[in-house]
Each structure stands twice: as C-alpha cells, then as structure tokens.
Amino acid sequence: MFNTLKILDLPENERPRERLIKYGSQALSNSELIAIILGTGGRNENVLSLSSRILKQCEGLNGLLTLTPEEIMTLKGIGSAKAAKIIAVGELAKRFKAYKSGDVYIIKSPGDVAGLVMEEMKYFKEEHLRVIMLNTKNIVISCKDVSIGSLNSAIVHPREVFCEALKKNSASIVICHNHPSGDPTPSSEDINVTKRLKQCGIILGINLLDHLIIGHSNYISLKEKNIL
C-alpha cells in the first residue's frame, strides 16, 4: 500500500509552514514555498522532495510556472489538484506584476507598455493580440486580448480591435502581440495589419499610438522603428 506523505510527517523544524511563520517568507527556498502550496507529497515521497524534484525537472521556477496544466500533470506526483494550485499561483504572480488593482498606469513610452504586458505575454505559446485602451491622459482604462493565433489581415478584423475601445470611450489604443519564437522582428504581415488598423483608427477617431511585438527577452516598437 502506498502512502501520501504530508508536511506534518516532517520534523517540526523542517516544516515549511512553521519556518515561514517563525522566520518569514523570505527565509524559505523556492522548493519550500512550492511545498506549502502543494500541501502533500506523492507516493512514498514527502512534499519537500517532490517540490525540489519538479523544480529541477522544470529548470527552476520560471519553467514550472509557464507550463500548461496538461504539461504539469505529466510530472510524477502531480495530479489535477496540485496542477491547479501551481497554475493559480503563477497567474496571480503575473497579474500582480503586470497591473496592480487600483493603480493608475500611465503610458509615456514603449517601455511603459512593455512593463505592463511583457512579463505575461513573452511566455505565450500562441500569438495573442492584446489591445490596451487609454484615456485622453494616456492612463490605461482596460486591456483585452482580441485574437489568438497567427496575426494576419484575414484573422485580425478592425471590428474586434476597436469594438471594446469604443465601448470604453478610449481616446487612443496601443496594440501588442507576441512572437512565440522569441524573435520580435516584425513580419510583413505584422506591418500590413498595423497600417490597416492605423487607418481604421483615424476614421473612428481613436489613435493607434504604437504596436509592440514581444519576444522572449526583448521587444520591438513599430513606432520607434518609424513603421507606424
């Protein structure tokens, strides 16, 4: 018979929860924090050992938190419940870093746009087109993904891009999309779609300020490249 080993099975001075309360979260390693999230180990493996192993398999925290639920569940000792906990923590971390609730986020440069979306979008495995809506003072009103898949004029329709902006009474928008390859160099289709959306924005009275292409470690602003 197999046993699922719990945190309480560990000596008290090795239990991550007790160590967190006594010494603070900063004193804990990534594997100890993951152990608290998981709560229990696997078959004949305590939760600290499980956490250390999956972090090693994923080459660290970034690798683990960018996996899909299906990919996480291929790891030995991780079922749907544990996978859901890991995915939830990763999503909360991305949302907290990207845009804190209640904050006023002002777009003054392409770097400001990258700071808002890059941490999340650089890990997407499919292309996402995101619209950032701004008021007259360039304060972010809302963000919305309007397309998932290849960015081309046949798929990306101005109606989807500008519909939400009109509802929000946006003065202007910035669009962003990621290249799963990691190379943010714009394709000819990227440029054509951008120019088409720019013209539609002029007609609707909503200025397209910039289009950022997000790579794994950098981004390209079509405005800075004088393409827009």
From Swiss-Prot:
Please provide the Gene Ontology terms (biological process) for this protein. Answer: proteolysis
The similarity annotation says: Belongs to the UPF0758 family.
Which residues are involved in binding Zn(2+)?
Answer: H177, H179, D190
Q: Which InterPro entries match?
A: MPN, RadC_JAB, RuvA_2-like, UPF0758, UPF0758_CS, UPF0758_N
Q: Where is this motif: JAMM motif?
A: 177-190
MPN domain: from which residue to which, for each copy? Answer: 106-228
One family name in Pfam for this protein: UPF0758_N
Q: Which UniProt keywords apply?
A: Hydrolase, Metal-binding, Metalloprotease, Protease, Zinc
Which molecular-function annotations from GO does this UniProt entry contain? metal ion binding; metallopeptidase activity
What's this protein's name?
A: UPF0758 protein NT01CX_1687
Write down the NCBIfam families for this protein, in alphabetical order: PRK00024.1 (NF000642), radc (TIGR00608)
Q: What PANTHER family is this protein classified in?
A: DNA REPAIR PROTEIN RADC, UPF0758 PROTEIN YEES-RELATED
- List the disulfide bonds in this chain: none
Sorted alphabetically, which SUPFAM superfamilies does this protein's record hold?
JAB1/MPN domain, RuvA domain 2-like
